[in-house]
Each structure stands twice: as structure tokens, then as C-alpha cells.
Amino acid sequence: MNLKPGVAWIIGGGSGIGAAVARELAGHGWQVAISGRRLDRLEEVSASHSGIHAYPLDITDAEAVAATVTAIAADFGRVDLLLYGAVAATGTPPGSYDAARFAAAFDVNVMGLVRLLDPVITQMSRQPTGGQIAVISSLAGYVGLPRGGAYAATKSALITLCQTMRVELEPKRIIVRLITPGFVKSELTARNRYRMPMLMETEDAAWRIVDGLVRSTRFEIAFPWPMVFVMKAARLLPYRLFFWLSALTLRAR
């Protein structure tokens, strides 16, 4: 399968992977709407290509979400691809489970997507060719590791939600895709104070995502493969061994 250029909407398109994917898609003839809270970031990205268009949005505002879906559909006639990449990355100190910190992470990372689903599904269901919903999770969502409680929990929630949606939305001609990258250079990863194996350039990650989206309909786009293998294998370990190895990572940081 080779997905023809159409209309894409990227949530979190003002920086990082979202911005890089917007440029990659626009370079291949797509019309790309990008959304995020910071208008200055969106305008900077949209100025880089005539096919990129800024739609400021607070993903925690359900009414604004519905209005933005309506606006994009009115401007372009359709939404062929939704890429959800909004992220609130919150580190959690070992043994600390602050409710406000967890709530903030879930409100953006998970509930932000949920607020989009009904209006986007309604729009895509009207389209003869349906559409695609792609969600950027993380390899961190495969297992729970120290200091990543809130972030990993949200990414794990996205993985299981996408698994559910893949089956439920197929009759509506909507293909759900899960994207699980490892460490990718961004403002968020720049804050990390620990070793990040196989840290990837943002543009490389964007190319892999776009290539996976347009060339196939497989469920998961995961990379880099050595990290994917390690993290998926970790899920198969006996808990006693897994917890012992997990404790080693806590001491090593």
C-alpha cells in the first residue's frame, strides 16, 4: 500500500517529532494542519512550508477540540490522517506519586486523545475512504521502570487503547496505528539527566514514521529495532528477574 497525499492533522506539531513529521508530509504533497498551545511555535513551523497550516489548540478544552475539527474539515474538505503527538513528560521521583503530577500527565497524554476521538471519527466516517488515526506512544509504555511512573503509565494506556480501537474502528474504514519510538532528540529528552541508549535524530524518527504510515497499514511502527527487542523481551521475563534488573537501572542513574 502507498497512501496518496491528503490532509493530515498533527497534534503537537509545533516542535519535536510532530513538527518534523509535518515538514516530511508537506514535502510529499500533503496539506498539513498543526495544532498546539503555542502560536509562535506553530507559525514558525508553518512558515517553513506552504503546505503547513497553524490551528492553535488547547487539547484539554473539549469544546475547542470539536471546533477545530470542524474548522479543518471546512477548510480542506476532509481529514485523512490524525497524528496524536501531544505529550506532557513528567518525571516522578522514586517513591513519590503526586496526584496532581499524574493527573496533568493523563489529561494531556491520554484524555487529550480521547477528546479528539468522537469528532474525528464522525468526520472520517463521512468520508468514502475513511481515514487513519495514528498515536505516538513510546517504548516506555511496554514496561514500568523507575522514575517513569506517570509518563510510562500514560504511554501504556495509549498502547492498550489503540489495540482496542484497531478492532472497533475497522468497520468504519478507520485504520488505527500505534507508533512506539525509543529515545528521540527533543526539548523533552534534553532535560533528561541519564543515559539514553540509541538516541535518534528527530528527522530520522520523522522519516521512519512517515514511511511506515504511507507504505503499509501494519498496526505498530516501532524503532529502533534493538531497543524494541530489548523492551518487548522484558515483558516476557519472570517478575523476579524483571524487578531485579529494574532495580539495577535505578541505581545506575
Name these PLM-found stretches.
Residues 48-63:
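Rossmann-fold cofactor-recognition segment
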Residues 14-15:
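Conserved glycine-rich cofactor-binding loop
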Residues 138:
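Residue(s) in the substrate-gating loop at a strand-loop-helix junction
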Residues 93-94, 98-106:
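Substrate-binding pocket helix/loop in short-chain dehydrogenase/reductase
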Residues 178, 194-231:
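C-terminal helical subdomain
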Residues 117, 154:
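Active-site helix of classical SDR
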Residues 95, 145-149:
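Active-site loop immediately N-terminal to the catalytic Tyr-X3-Lys motif
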